[in-house]
Amino acid sequence: MNIRKAIPSDLIEIMSIYSIARDFMIESGNPQWGHSYPPEELIQEDIENGACHLIFDEEGVHGVFALFDGIEPTYQHIEDGKWLNDEPYVTVHRIASDGKAHGIFKCAINYCKGISDNIRIDTHKSNLIMQKQIEKNGFQKCGTIYVRESPRIAYQWSNKY
């Protein structure tokens, strides 16, 4: 698997992957993204800002995620715990797969580990599959943050712990 930054012409394929992921989430009882998240405008913004990344192989694109460097506003306040450290970090958002390839999450996280010593990510309490992937890849549960007034389980990976 390889990773590259998305370009505007990738938008249709990216939105297709998000549609597949939303359907899977709903089928597995996870309401986190509903029927319309993430909206196309947000993905266009991620592409323009260089945050949107694609995971692909010789058969095509199988995954997408957004990677942000710097302070994540929703992580400024954490309840029921604390972050592992206050050092600079990158944040992974909106990771999704087309379901046709294995190891999408691990591939994305390994890429991120090559960029930063600290990675933060969050997920919905109903997203049991993502919780398992996050924990399997060495992240520690740190507490609860809020996204659009909805609680999320917050995790951090640091190469110092």
Can you name each region flagged by the protein language model?
Residues N2-S16:
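A short beta-loop-alpha structural element at the N-terminal edge
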Residues A66-K100:
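Conserved acyl-donor/pantetheine-binding loop and adjacent beta-alpha core of acyl/acetyltransferases
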Residues S97-G114, Q131-K136:
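Conserved acetyl-CoA-binding loop-helix of GNAT-fold acetyltransferases
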Residues R22-L42:
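Conserved GNAT-fold acetyl-CoA-binding loop/helix
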Residues T91, G114-S126:
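Conserved GNAT acetyl-CoA-binding A-motif
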Residues L54, G60-G70:
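Conserved beta-strand in the GNAT
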Residues D122, Q140-A154:
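Conserved catalytic-core motifs of GNAT/GCN5-like acyltransferases
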Residues S126-G143:
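Conserved active-site alpha-helix within GNAT-family acetyltransferase domains
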